[in-house]
């Protein structure tokens, strides 16, 4: 067989992951994942991160120890080539590392890149994210599909939404949709895309009993929103333990300036 | 236009942030912020730190990843030049980094420098600070404006107050005022200044659902008081979870020596 | 006497622990233990790790500070020579470090190597493991001998069992047997072996009020399963504090694909 | 005046703190304190550590940031010279750093060295130690003066007592006396010494609402016992939150071997 995939795998385009620039995606993904490991976000090979640079998408492989990843471990995929693929489940890798399998998170990362034009997508298994979805579960169907919190300063760390300028305000209510987990991570894709359609301004989707996907225009925005969200999830769990509500009705004490 | 600001921005005084001394403010702010990031104080670009050296004030920009800051990212401002500005909200920067915006915390840091002659001011979004203000909120208006704790050894980490020598004693009650958060961080300034007037001896002000501002005569004192305060906030939350009161009436068992 | 043991101890085979390869077991055990110390798994000389490479078993000594261990501190033992020993409690070391005693965990590590053909075995004193056994203890005899959790994504981090390919699924229930602690760690061995016989697919055994033993085909698998398990133990304790059950009956929302 | 103190201060014996050996006390105290800072044991200049080498005692100064200490900051004192001093509160320093004051912990460290022949003494302000003393306080006078825990493996990390060989067993009950805090740290000395007399086998004394002092024959033993104790304090607080008792009556399941 002589498909582009096979050809590319043969000469394998190793130059795509070789750079002395610490901000090159192939260097940045391992550095980010090592940092995320210390935060408990990518424990035991769970979770991960992907970066898009124009048409190219850089992806960590399946099942690696995230704090030990190397640039040589990174997959590279072309969005344009992928779009031309007849089978949506078939990936067209420009570069594949030896001895690895692609991550099951790949179609979820691609959804953020193609539907939201994101430059980076992070997936964590953070305890706080999982606990928030478990706490919501006890509130009965209907109320359990949305995490809401307001009147916390850290909410300002979020943009107003895709294609909108500016960030949320202190009195705004941050809403993060929750989707149910599926037996196979790839099967989450359609539910993630549905949530993106229903919540066009969200930069994150919680996955019940699993974790969270967070994306942003670039690495900086995806990472800082992921940190802010994890902060809010942790705070929400601690508030629950102290019997404090996540949403309150506080009147602005000072008129909001434009 | 030919104002000093524009002139200064043109030649930009980069020498003000270039030093091989690790204790130079332009080197120290990034080092401190990297350390604070590991403590969870400046998650997701929240929080920050500012240092004053005689007339010059060194400030981190808005929206940066605090653990990745570099000396080149630092703003420098002259207190004397600022005092002559007709518009209090207009900042007169001697040096501005490219591609950044000044931090909204700037007027709050300046309040500590001008009203308290502080040499350093730290602003954290620590969970423990936020949780303490949330717990106080449940105690009803009137009781919710002051964090109080006594009979804990770590209280000795605080000075007696601005212009006074010596530290608090074990049996003294540490009181930290709480101000309400505002939609825009700059609008906090007048409330912070009010709290400084009402509590002339305090080295810190809590901001409801937001975090804490802590200052001191120099970096050493601001940092160690901020650590001691965060320790006490964490202890207070843990005491609350265990049903233990923050203020107790313990008689000294040994006569206090002078 | 002129036994192989004595001979080997005399010339002591130091070459067995000298390698410039960071993945050599004598280098890897100290690096792993330093990492585990930061996770709170091997506090105060407790816990440890052992690696098997073909016939050779590499072991940390008793009572060392795990974050300060050096390759020179490592014991080496031959499984073949050990199998020929008449006294099962007598160890036949090819290489012994000066000034140390062998670890009491040795026979437990050997059980994982000989009965499960493991390539690595990790023993932690993690708080979360101990707390899980304490919580189970309150559920009465009969129910206290097995930790069970299901419908959490991280469960997928576990293999289906010794000699089976593939990992557990999201809806599978992870079961970890609990054995009672004994006054002497060596006396745990027979109970650990019994649990291995009763739970042929398990990769871990909890020890009541003590910690956990986790093994795997190689270092990668043992370490990532140990991380996943610690994540689940922590989650289980947090779920208990929030009144959430560890085992739930959730129907798959999407047909499971083969 | 021409006392030995003054003389020694003049030539100041800087050689006593200058060594290229990382295990020299003047190098080891800063390294240990930096590690303890990351554990939350010496937050905000609280806590510290002292090492004795034969007649010489090495001490950190008062009020320093413990993670930034340098060998040049260390005080050195002679036990023999100290013993000849007429005023017990007067310290006879062989070497004093410039611009510092001696630590108020000094007489407490000296008590461990002179009354227990310790080689190292560590003082932490760990949250867990403070919380344990607060929890005990709620149990009423009489029951509040002793922390007790048993049937936890980590108890084996403690020696049987001063001058005795071997460690505690799994079924032994670890008992740590609690003394009341005093307004001045130096005033704790007599109560610490009383507790040492009443509990001749203990290697630690808790100080109510303050922290813990832990000592050992050498640095290794003091540090690992301090780690084990902090582990047990943390576990005890977590057990309290889960409603689990610290002391239980478990019969050995296997006959204890000699």
Swiss-Prot record, chains A, B, C, D:
Molecular functions per Gene Ontology: methylthioribulose 1-phosphate dehydratase activity; zinc ion binding
One GO cellular component term: cytoplasm
Cofactor(s) of this protein: Zn(2+)
GO biological processes: L-methionine salvage from methylthioadenosine
InterPro entries the UniProt entry points to: Aldolase_II/adducin_N, Aldolase_II/adducin_N_sf, MethylthioRu-1-P_deHdtase_MtnB, Salvage_MtnB_euk
Keywords for the protein's UniProt record, in alphabetical order: Amino-acid biosynthesis, Cytoplasm, Lyase, Metal-binding, Methionine biosynthesis, Zinc
Signal peptide bounds: none
Catalytic activity: 5-(methylsulfanyl)-D-ribulose 1-phosphate = 5-methylsulfanyl-2,3-dioxopentyl phosphate + H2O
Cofactor: how and how many bound: Binds 1 zinc ion per subunit.
The EC number(s) this enzyme carries: 4.2.1.109
Record: residues binding Zn(2+): 123, 125, 210
Pfam families according to UniProt: Aldolase_II
First-tier enzyme category under EC: lyase
UniProt keyword annotation of tRNA-binding present: no
UniProt binding sites for substrate: 105
Annotated stretches, region: Disordered: 1-21
Record localization: Cytoplasm
PANTHER family xref list: METHYLTHIORIBULOSE-1-PHOSPHATE DEHYDRATASE (PTHR10640:SF7)
Function: Catalyzes the dehydration of methylthioribulose-1-phosphate (MTRu-1-P) into 2,3-diketo-5-methylthiopentyl-1-phosphate (DK-MTP-1-P).
Protein name from the UniProt record: Methylthioribulose-1-phosphate dehydratase
């Amino acid at each position: 067989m002589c498909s582009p995939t096979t050809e590319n795998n043969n000469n394998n385009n190793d130059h795509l992951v070789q750079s002395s620039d610490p901000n090159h995606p192939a260097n940045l993904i391992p550095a980010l994942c090592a940092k995320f490991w210390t935060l408990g976000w990518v424990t035991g090979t769970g979770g991960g991160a992907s970066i898009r640079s124009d048409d190219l998408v850089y992806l960590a492989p399946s099942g690696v120890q995230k704090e030990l990843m190397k640039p040589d471990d990174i997959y590279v995929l072309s969005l344009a080539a992928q779009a031309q693929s007849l089978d949506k489940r078939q990936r067209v890798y420009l570069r594949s590392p030896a001895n690895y399998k692609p991550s099951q998170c790949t179609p979820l990362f691609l959804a953020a890149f193609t539907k939201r034009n994101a430059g980076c997508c992070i997936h964590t298994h953070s305890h706080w994210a999982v606990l928030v979805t478990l706490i919501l579960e006890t509130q009965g169907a209907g109320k359990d599909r949305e995490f809401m919190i307001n009147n916390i300063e850290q909410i300002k760390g979020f943009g107003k939404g895709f294609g909108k300028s500016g960030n949320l305000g202190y009195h705004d209510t941050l809403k993060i949709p929750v989707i149910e987990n599926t037996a196979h991570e790839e099967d989450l894709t359609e539910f993630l895309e549905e949530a993106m359609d229903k919540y066009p301004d969200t930069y994150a989707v919680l996955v019940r009993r699993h974790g969270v996907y967070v994306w942003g225009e670039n690495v900086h925005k995806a990472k800082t929103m992921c940190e802010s969200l994890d902060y809010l999830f942790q705070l929400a769990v601690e508030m629950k333990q102290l019997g404090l509500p996540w949403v309150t009705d506080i009147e602005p004490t000072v008129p909001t300036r434009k």
